């Protein structure tokens, strides 16, 4: 989802992680589009996909920038603005288009909703009124920017603390989180536990911790055994647990033990052989992974437009057509955005603002 470059100290991308971005974006996509076909919501896909991307971000940033942080060569200000200007123009474009289309339909937003979304501070306010405004997925960008701000500090701390203290601290944090989370009303789950930047920084920190063990544990290379069968089994087990858990736990905490393990297994699988690794390292999968951020930002609007054009009469046949056309259209739109909007705008910003 976030465009995190791996060229700083580690010159090779972890290709399996790059491709996995698309697979988990697809889960998020299905959570917003499959209900008419499945006749039930697929919130697991959205919440699991979001958890994966926060963990992945912590891991990948550590892989790409961690050595610089350790050596004291990390330029936090440049790092933040580089990533901000990669995210913000596309957010601004889709926010503006969505607001304009909604206005035509008689849907308007107040000044607080507009301001918090434009400034990407909406998740700091514990209210659904400001959370999913216009292009609703932009809340994720607010949390992402906060993770960028605290990355260097978290990396230094989490990679230097003793393992025993880290284990005790994480156990205590999980216990306190669970006790407090259970006091949150169901209606407040999204605007607090699911989206608050301070709480999603836990997932991000788990990604940094996962990188720490990926880098330092001698037996880590044995992890990709039975890849991807173990990983699919883990996700299915979590899916089963998801069905019986309360929203306060399943929206985020449920994924804490699983997503770091899956990220590390994906990373170690990059050096292994097997049909799954070859598939993830293939050019089509690498390309799909490279447009995952554009897919994420564009997909809600594309789903709306496709459903308006194709129509929907409640039948499974038309729901399936809508889903298929939406997925293909979103991928094509994402590639067009990357090639003709994101890349040119980023190049201009890099030349004029980030020299």
Where are the regions a protein language model picked out?
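Alpha-helical transmembrane segments of multi-pass integral membrane proteins
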Residues: 204, 231-343
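Hydrophobic alpha-helical segments with transmembrane-like composition
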Residues: 122-177, 337-339
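Short, Lys/Arg-rich, polar N-terminal cytosolic tail immediately upstream
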Residues: 1-14
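Structural signal for the C-terminal ends of transmembrane alpha-helices
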Residues: 62-69, 101-103, 153-161, 209-218, ...
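Interfacial loop-to-helix transition and helix-capping segments at the boundaries
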Residues: 14-15, 38-50, 129-143, 183-206, ...
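Transmembrane alpha-helical segments and their boundary/interface "anchor" motifs
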Residues: 21, 47-50, 54, 65-102, ...
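Aromatic-anchored segments of alpha-helical transmembrane domains
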Residues: 26-33, 121-124, 171-183, 232-245, ...
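Membrane-interfacial entry segments at the cytosolic side of transmembrane helices
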Residues: 161-169, 221-230, 248, 318-321
């Amino acid at each position: 989802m976030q465009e995190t470059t791996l060229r700083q100290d580690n010159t090779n991308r972890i290709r399996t992680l790059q491709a996995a971005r698309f697979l988990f974006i697809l889960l998020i996509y299905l959570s917003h589009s499959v209900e008419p076909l499945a006749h039930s919501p697929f919130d697991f896909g959205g919440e699991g996909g979001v958890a994966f991307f926060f963990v992945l971000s912590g891991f990948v940033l550590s892989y790409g920038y961690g050595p610089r942080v350790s050596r004291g060569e990390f330029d936090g200000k440049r790092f933040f603005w580089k990533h901000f200007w990669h995210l913000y123009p596309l957010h601004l474009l889709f926010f503006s288009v969505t607001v304009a289309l909604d206005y035509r339909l008689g849907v308007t937003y107040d000044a607080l909703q507009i301001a918090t979304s434009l400034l990407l501070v909406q998740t700091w306010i514990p209210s659904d009124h400001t959370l999913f405004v216009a292009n609703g997925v932009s809340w994720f960008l607010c949390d992402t920017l906060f993770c960028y701000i605290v990355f260097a500090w978290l990396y230094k701390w989490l990679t230097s603390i003793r393992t025993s203290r880290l284990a005790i601290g994480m156990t205590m944090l999980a216990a306190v989180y669970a006790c407090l989370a259970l006091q949150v009303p169901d209606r407040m789950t999204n605007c607090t536990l699911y989206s608050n930047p301070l709480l999603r920084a836990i997932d991000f920190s788990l990604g940094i911790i996962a990188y720490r063990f990926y880098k330092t544990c001698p037996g880590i290379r044995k992890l990709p055994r039975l890849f991807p069968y173990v990983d699919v089994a883990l996700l299915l087990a979590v899916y089963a647990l998801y069905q019986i858990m309360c929203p306060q736990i399943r929206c985020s905490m449920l994924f804490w033990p699983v997503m770091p393990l899956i990220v590390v297994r994906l990373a170690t699988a990059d050096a292994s052989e097997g049909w799954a690794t070859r598939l993830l390292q293939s050019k089509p999968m690498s390309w799909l992974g490279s447009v995952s951020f554009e897919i994420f930002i564009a997909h809600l609007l594309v789903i709306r437009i496709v459903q308006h054009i194709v129509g929907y009469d409640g039948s499974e046949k038309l729901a399936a057509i809508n889903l298929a056309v939406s997925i293909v259209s979103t991928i094509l739109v994402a590639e067009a955005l990357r090639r003709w909007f994101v890349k040119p705008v980023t190049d201009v910003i890099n030349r004029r603002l980030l020299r």
